[in-house]
């Protein structure tokens, strides 16, 4: 059996279509995976795109002809038990034959099983794809390994199943070669500190083995623990101002690019080093928002993360130029009394969220991705996340502005907001696909870059401060003549690629191809 993986931000919107043969379940409600009726595809890489993939697979807003799964039938979502799917997940659905590209495939199978590995981030969608080597995915075809958590509703929610997972244990993992990968930035960026453990830096020779396709502009943002956000509001607007604790865009505090670089390169070790007039941020904070220590905590991503790679590109020039300073590295068990920033390296976006939230509350959830040892009270922490995260404000962290600009589709399309990159899909040209898998992968990539699909997936990224998420790239789609974002068909007028050169996120973005009448907004 082979592997089917949906791009971390692409899977969800692709569901829907004509009814097909029902998926068979056992007495415990666990699907029985039948190789004769199920295409299997394995996708590894970007964890930041995870919510996008969920939406791609479930949204009924996506036109029927563009869906991958049949949303008229129940969809099953598998998650690794320990992290609740932050590291590993898989989706089982009826294949949507109302999509012309998926009708009449060889093998005549009715169902689709897509495995998605988030653990290790974007580089796991690059380095193993180049090497065409097996990495661990979730094992879902052993009923004793899995338990149903909740029942879903067709077209609305998944039936959720948890499966025990242990990397390196073939009884509790599924080693497979990724059919394709997804990365927040283009593959060449995975060198130096961006190289994942166990793999070599990406070279020009490596790139020649791949087909790489830019699919979407993905917006990132600086995330801070909620009490830190509130303290920043106190320092910005005054402790008694109505903006303190508010989620409105006019109440979002801001950090400048140079301040962000100073923090993430480890130049600051205490929140007292962020000055407020003749005082400082820590001393200025009210008792309810002040942490028990002024030590600066950073939730960063592990080497190989695309989220971390884009942070380096946008704020430190790393690895784009030889004199760039790379981000500060994990400090491990360093005592908090040492005058050095505490750096916590997280393997996925879900783990990043946990790091920020648990430091904010001074608590720890045993057995999950982040082991918080700072349990005497709250700490202020800062991190980086894709803007499709936490739109429902369910985690104890918040986005802030960068250089005074909020991270919205509108501000990106106007050329005002800087922290966005173009994510790519890639597959190895020599990879051996099972029957019809290549056609499914091609359609998955195509629909991931479809602005009509993005309009549907972006509904999960509506924040109190504006619409965030993804925009289609201008290489395959036309931006509006005015340069304003069309939320029903969002296309970025800017690109890190040119009409003569492929996407490279180290390139300063510019308008792609305005023709004789197109343009960009002045304000």
Language model feature labels by segment:
Residues 22-523:
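Flexible loop/hinge segments at secondary-structure junctions
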Residues 1-21:
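Gram-negative bacterial Sec-dependent N-terminal signal peptides
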